[in-house]
Every structure is written in structure tokens, then in C-alpha cells.
């Protein structure tokens, strides 16, 4: 059975445009995997704590030297990475907050991007270890003009960061869908959301 791991990060449980796009992407995934299962992790309802010094020490300490405290500090990271490894596809939904991502999503990333677990380093180059999986990203922007060439494009630290960090740990098939102007005039914001949803409807069924 195929599995989709869905990560939601908007602080808004209701009325979130990024979650709405995520619902549509999830529906397209289900069209291609009708018997599949969706594992959900809502970072607003159940925030992931930021990593601490002991967590970082546990990441970089050789296995035979890890202390009980380090082991306890990396239990959550092990669990989150296990969810990614067990899934056939990953769906992340996120709004842009102050040109970047919600801190809850960054905290999740800091637990998941981990040496020897999701990325290898041979002293010269890095190699992602999360391979053979598709990733889907739904982004919502309060303002407009973040498209390539737009006046706010240089301030988009959400899409480039997410695509780079996912690629860094091994994802190669990354589909990004976004909606802009969600904080603008109500009619224009609704039209932008409808256009983004229609674009998702026109996608082929998403691969697991």
C-alpha cells in the first residue's frame, strides 16, 4: 500500500490557503493511489520542538559514544525521519511568513536533515539518502509578484529554500504549487485561489 506523508505548517487550522492547496494535491495523489494511506503531521496543532545542544551532539557523535542523554534527545528526530523513510511521497503545505517559512516547519526540517541518516558526507561532497520518493509542496503568499521576474521575487526565501533542502536530502521529483495575493482584495484573492486549484485539477494523477 502506498503512503503519503503530509506535513501542514500554517498557524491557521481553518481558512488556510496553503492547507486548501494541500487538500487538492492530496486528492490528486489519491487519484493515482486509491488504496493508499495518508499519514498526517500538523505542526500547528502538534508543534515539533526546536533542536537543542544535546540533540545536535547526538547527531554528530559516533554511535558507540552516544550517551543516554543524547539518545533521548534524538528520539523525536528518529521518529520524524522514520515517517519520511516509510512514506512513498511527501506533501508539505506552508504559508510565507515574513519572506520565509513558519518556524514550526523549520524545526521539523532541523530534525529531519541529519548527517548519516538523511544525508551522507564523505569529506568532500554531500549525498542525499532519501531517494526514490516524490515531494509535493503547496505554498501561499500574502502578497503578489513573487513569480520569477516579479518585484518581490528576490524576497522569496520559502520556495527556493524548500526545494533546495528537499533536493539536498535526496528528493529529485519535486512539484511546487503556489497561490499569491491571499491577503489582498477578497475577490482577487478568491480568484487567485481558484486558479491555483484549477491548475492542480489539471495535473495528472500524482505519482506515489
From Swiss-Prot:
Zinc among the record's keywords?
no
Q: Which reaction does it catalyse?
A: 2 a quinone + NADH + H(+) = 2 a 1,4-benzosemiquinone + NAD(+); N,N-dimethyl-1,4-phenylenediamine + anthranilate + 2 NAD(+) = 2-(4-dimethylaminophenyl)diazenylbenzoate + 2 NADH + 2 H(+)
- Report any Pfam family annotated for this entry: Flavodoxin_2
Molecular function GO labels = electron transfer activity; FMN binding; oxidoreductase activity, acting on NAD(P)H as acceptor; oxidoreductase activity, acting on NAD(P)H, quinone or similar compound as acceptor
Entry's InterPro entries? Flavodoxin_fold, Flavoprotein-like_sf, FMN-dep_NADH:Q_OxRdtase_AzoR1, NADH:quinone_OxRdtase_FMN_depd
Q: Which domain of life is it from?
A: Bacteria
Top EC class of this enzyme: oxidoreductase
Which co-factor is required? FMN
Q: How is the cofactor bound?
A: Binds 1 FMN per subunit.
Q: Which of UniProt's keywords are assigned here?
A: Flavoprotein, FMN, NAD, Oxidoreductase
Residues annotated for FMN binding in this entry: 10, 16-18, 96-99
Stretches assigned to coiled coil: none
Enzyme nomenclature, EC number: 1.6.5.-, 1.7.1.17
Q: State its role.
A: Quinone reductase that provides resistance to thiol-specific stress caused by electrophilic quinones.
Quaternary structure and interacting proteins, as annotated: Homodimer.
> Would you identify the family this protein belongs to, as annotated?
Belongs to the azoreductase type 1 family.
Q: What is this protein called?
A: FMN-dependent NADH:quinone oxidoreductase
